[in-house]
């Protein structure tokens, strides 16, 4: 038992869910019918293995809380005169915190999935993918170098592709998983180039060694500065894609085509968290280059504002939460870019539990609307057809409200402490940056409370859908089963209390992380006023949402802005609903542009290249056809041709010789 809770047993944390995935996958391939008959057993095994991983992670976290030092274990994999590749695991405060975060969310998601996916024919395949996804993220967190982190980085991307396209018979799901995979290919390729570029100069993949040697090389030879800046930019492109930052954010909303438990895991603790984790892991390297830190800040604040403005007008429940995730990830990037390392990780933790709660709550709503509105996501996820669900789903409503208040930044819920700290640090760093972050907080309050009101308050509007399609249903919406409710209740407590690990009164997280940034703890009255103003602007956004959607939302057809507000507001609504026309631009540039280029190349190939080849053959054919008539067999014709040739030579040669003589 002592070995299990020792540092050297850390490899068990990713290995247990990996073995669970292997057993389920092997069973599906080799013993399909027996495996399907034991489907619930496989689901239970998957949950138990991740639960044991969580217990080991909790033990490691506790060891660091009481003051243990870092631990690294490496063994050589490929060693020769030219290259040395090592694998292993690295335990420090950052990895121990992330291990507990990933495993705790994964256990709750798997427990929830027993109820949500119970009737799905591919139940075992779902848990196999889910276990592999969790194992890949845990392996990424434990990676001691860039080489190993890239291996698990790719595995995380592959698992997201499999899970987003889990219902691959749906055209939208098949398209969404391809979109996610291709978009992330851009970031992954840049990340690979950045890793290879740094290895070329530093001859190492180790995080600490790469940072130290980079600093030494730059201090000794400043001519290599721009090369290292470029490599750092390439490294950052990986998190841009993985964490859905502008301009590679377009895949995340479409990823909602996957099962809702997967959406919760992707948005809370795996896929998008991987990008933030990599920035945190490479934070000392990025700090060497102020231009890279400024780029991280600019990308982050633009993404935060973009995500919040698009979320204002979305009518799909899960996509509204997806754009919320994009916005909150932007906040985390802002924190990293301005040097607020601890605040960024703090918001990663608080947002993970709050967003997992919101997605699992939305899954509870969708799961109970499917028998009534059908299994088409355009109907059962449409906020237009919801409303009044709080009457029949009180526990789901209450837990969803807790997640909403947390994400809005209402004290004392978890996200209040983390988001407020990021906004405060943004004000300190730059006034304009703080202003945009502050406005984004107000928008967050509006769109999150709007989602809650449209889903749970007022009267049930699903009758509109039923009447429109001449359908009658005797089924009623009811509360979810205990498999789904217990994770919601646990996440509600976490969303309420997890924020107290880092407060202005005592910052336990700062002490635990041993943050590389020294903070100015002096707080002015102006700073306190700014902190309270962020709460105020969030409340203003919530009040505006309440005034619009709380009372007469049964008659809302989302033409409100067009009918009752000025044209400029309607145009802003259209701008938001059209997602800033970014996807329209991408479609015109890449999809239509590629098709037009292919069409142009087709015509060039057909008429120019093939034309030259075909012209050679045709000209030879015509020449042969014309010459065959001259081969008549008559001697007089041949003599006439010889005479003509002789006359030409007789007159041409003297003329040519005279020109040569004059020269």
Curated annotation (Swiss-Prot):
Topology in membrane? Multi-pass membrane protein
An example Gene Ontology molecular-function term:
NADH dehydrogenase (ubiquinone) activity
Output a single Gene Ontology CC term carried by this record: chloroplast thylakoid membrane
Write out the catalysed reaction: a plastoquinone + NADH + (n+1) H(+)(in) = a plastoquinol + NAD(+) + n H(+)(out); a plastoquinone + NADPH + (n+1) H(+)(in) = a plastoquinol + NADP(+) + n H(+)(out)
Q: Which InterPro entries match?
A: NADH_UbQ_OxRdtase_chlpt_su5_C, NADHpl_OxRdtase_5_subgr, ND/Mrp_TM, NU5C-like, Proton_antipo_N
Pfam families tied to this protein: Proton_antipo_C, Proton_antipo_M, Proton_antipo_N
Keywords in UniProt for this one?
Chloroplast, Membrane, NAD, NADP, Plastid, Plastoquinone, Quinone, Thylakoid, Translocase, Transmembrane, Transmembrane helix, Transport
List all membrane-crossing ranges.
11-31, 41-61, 89-109, 126-146, 149-169, 189-209, 224-244, 260-280, 292-312, 329-349, 398-418, 436-456, 482-502, 528-548, 607-627, 635-655
What does the UniProt entry say about where the protein is found?
Plastid, Chloroplast thylakoid membrane
KW ATP-binding (keyword) present: no
Biological role stated in the UniProt entry: NDH shuttles electrons from NAD(P)H:plastoquinone, via FMN and iron-sulfur (Fe-S) centers, to quinones in the photosynthetic chain and possibly in a chloroplast respiratory chain. The immediate electron acceptor for the enzyme in this species is believed to be plastoquinone. Couples the redox reaction to proton translocation, and thus conserves the redox energy in a proton gradient.
Q: Tell me the protein family, please.
A: Belongs to the complex I subunit 5 family.
Tell me the protein's name: NAD(P)H-quinone oxidoreductase subunit 5, chloroplastic
Source organism per entry reads Chara vulgaris
């Amino acid at each position: 038992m002592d070995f299990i809770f020792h540092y050297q047993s850390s490899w068990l944390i990713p290995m247990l869910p990996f073995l669970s995935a292997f057993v389920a996958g092997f069973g599906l391939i080799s013993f399909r019918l027996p495996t399907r008959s034991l489907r619930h057993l496989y689901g239970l095994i998957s949950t138990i293995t991740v639960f044991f991983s969580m217990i080991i992670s909790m033990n490691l976290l506790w060891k660091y809380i009481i003051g243990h030092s870092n631990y690294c274990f490496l063994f050589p994999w490929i060693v020769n005169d030219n290259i040395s590749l090592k694998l292993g695991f690295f335990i420090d405060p950052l990895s121990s915190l992330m291990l507990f975060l990933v495993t705790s969310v994964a256990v709750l998601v798997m427990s929830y999935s027993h109820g949500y996916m119970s009737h799905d024919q591919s139940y075992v395949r779902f848990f196999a993918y889910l276990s592999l996804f969790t194992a890949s993220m845990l392996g990424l967190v434990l990676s001691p170098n860039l080489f190993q982190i890239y291996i698990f980085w790719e595995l995380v991307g592959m698992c997201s592709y499999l899970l987003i396209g889990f219902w691959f018979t749906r055209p939208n799901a098949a398209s969404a998983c391809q979109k996610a995979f291709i978009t992330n290919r851009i970031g992954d390729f840049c990340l690979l180039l950045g890793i290879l570029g740094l290895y070329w100069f530093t001859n190492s993949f180790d995080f600490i060694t790469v940072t130290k040697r980079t600093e030494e090389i730059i201090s000794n030879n400043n001519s290599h500065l721009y090369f290292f800046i470029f490599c750092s930019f390439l490294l950052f492109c990986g998190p841009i894609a993985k964490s859905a930052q502008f301009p590679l954010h377009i895949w995340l909303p479409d990823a909602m085509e996957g099962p809702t438990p997967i959406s919760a895991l992707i948005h809370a603790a795996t896929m998008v968290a991987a990008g933030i984790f990599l920035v945190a892991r490479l934070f000392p390297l990025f700090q060497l280059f102020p231009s890279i830190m400024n780029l991280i800040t600019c990308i982050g604040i633009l993404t935060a504002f973009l995500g919040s403005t698009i979320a204002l007008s979305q009518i799909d429940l899960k996509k509204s939460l997806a754009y919320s995730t994009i916005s909150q990830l932007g906040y985390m990037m802002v924190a990293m870019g301005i040097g607020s390392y601890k605040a960024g990780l703090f918001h990663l933790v608080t947002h993970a539990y709050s967003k997992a709660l919101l997605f699992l709550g939305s899954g509870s709503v969708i799961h109970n609307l499917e028998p009534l509105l059908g299994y088409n996501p355009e109907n059962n996820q449409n906020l237009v057809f919801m409303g009044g669900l709080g009457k029949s789903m009180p526990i789901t409503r209450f837990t969803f409200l807790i997640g909403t208040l947390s994400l809005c930044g209402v004290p004392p819920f978890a996200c209040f402490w983390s988001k407020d700290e990021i906004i405060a640090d943004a004000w300190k760093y730059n006034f304009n940056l703080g202003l945009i972050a502050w406005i984004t907080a107000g928008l967050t309050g509006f769109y999150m409370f709007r989602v809650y009101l449209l889903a749970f308050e007022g009267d049930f509007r699903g009758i509109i859908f039923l009447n429109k399609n001449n359908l009658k249903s005797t089924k009623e919406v009811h509360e979810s089963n205990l498999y789904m409710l217990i994770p919601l209740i646990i996440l509600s407590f976490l969303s309420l209390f997890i924020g107290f690990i880092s407060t202005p009164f005592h910052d336990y997280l700062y002490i635990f992380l041993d943050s590389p940034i020294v903070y100015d703890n002096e707080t002015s009255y102006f700073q306190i006023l700014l902190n309270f103003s962020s709460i105020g602007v969030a409340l203003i956004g919530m009040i505006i949402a309440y005034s619009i959607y709380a009372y007469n939302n049964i008659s809302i057809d989302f033409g409100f802005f067009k009918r009752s507000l000025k044209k400029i507001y309607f145009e802003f609504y259209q701008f938001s609903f059209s997602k800033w026309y970014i996807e329209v631009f991408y479609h015109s540039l890449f999809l239509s542009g590629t098709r037009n280029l292919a069409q142009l190349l087709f015509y060039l190939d057909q008429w120019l290249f093939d034309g030259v080849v075909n012209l050679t053959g045709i000209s030879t054919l015509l020449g042969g056809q014309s010459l065959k008539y001259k081969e008549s067999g008559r001697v007089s014709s041949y003599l006439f041709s010889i005479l003509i040739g002789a006359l030409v030579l007789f007159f041409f040669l003297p003329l040519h010789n005279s020109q040569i003589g004059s020269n």
